[in-house]
Design a protein with these regions (language model features):
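Positively charged n-region of N-terminal signal peptides that target proteins for export
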Residues: 1-4
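Hydrophobic helical h-region of N-terminal Sec-dependent signal peptides
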Residues: 6-14
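Membrane engagement elements in two modes
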Residues: 7, 18-175, 179-190, 196-254
Length: 254
């Protein structure tokens, strides 16, 4: 009888200890609970590679990068360079990115993804960049990113690529430099740049909006440098063998 009472008391003490631990955890400040939950989530394996595909048969993905992290919240930086394989000029209305699991189930979707240029000529490329965040508790479920493109029916401008541009990494910044090699002042130059690792995975991307440079005149022989602070996920993977590529466009009305 005494032995049974002792076992019962021990069981009650264990239950009490467990309950006390739960209560103490519940009484933690909310920010500390978030950190604890993030630490547990980050222990789950993050995919080393995620496929990036294009749902539009007119374009194919030439290069991409998906940098996942789950320290305090599930998020992803997604970058892609797509080529227009059709024979038609593509005026881009919007670009969407959808995160899918291995079964093709949608985990998250982002509309109106940043892209450059707004009109993609046949054989030319388009850059796309998006920051996805808080889209799934377990980023290990992400198997692929699907890119969808919606185009306009009319084209009222032409984006002409200019080769007088270069990109490089300086410290924690991705830099892009455009030089006006013509005899006239140039207005409205729009630039973009990527930095990739030795395997071709894009680690970060710089994209300008045409509204940023619409009123900026670059005189003959002058240069302008823009820069973007690299994301933390890019800095962790950046090595001396990084490769940079730059794009520059001038917009002409049709």
């Amino acid at each position: 009888m005494k032995k049974g009472i002792a076992l019962l008391a021990a069981g009650m003490m264990l239950c009490g200890a467990a309950a006390s631990a739960d209560v103490l955890d519940y009484l933690k400040p909310i920010w500390l609970q978030v950190i604890d939950s993030g630490s547990n989530a980050s222990e789950k394996q993050i995919p080393e590679s995620v496929a990036v595909i294009c749902a539009d048969e007119r374009m194919t993905v030439e290069a991409s990068g998906v940098l996942l992290e789950n320290d305090y919240a599930a998020e992803a930086h997604v970058y892609a360079v797509l080529r227009n394989n059709s024979r038609e000029r593509l005026p881009i209305y919007s670009v969407q990115m959808t995160a899918l699991d291995a079964a093709g189930k949608k985990l998250h979707e982002e509309s109106y993804v940043s892209h450059l240029p707004d009109v993609v000529e046949p054989g030319e490329t388009m850059l796309a960049s998006e920051w996805m965040y808080d889209f799934v508790k377990d980023v290990s479920k992400v198997a692929s990113i699907r890119i969808s493109i919606e185009t306009n029916s009319r084209v009222n401008e032409k984006w002409i690529r200019n080769e007088d541009v270069q990109a490089w990494v300086e410290g924690k910044y991705l830099c892009v430099k455009f030089t006006n090699t013509t005899d006239a002042t140039i207005f409205g130059v729009v630039c973009g740049a990527t930095v990739s690792d030795a395997d071709g995975q894009i680690l970060d991307m710089l994209l300008q909006s045409e509204y940023e440079t619409d009123d900026l005149g670059i005189e003959p022989g002058s240069s302008v440098i823009w820069r973007k602070e690299l994301e933390d996920t890019a800095m962790l993977k950046l090595n001396t063998d990084a490769v940079c590529e730059a794009w520059a466009y001038q917009i002409e009305s049709l």
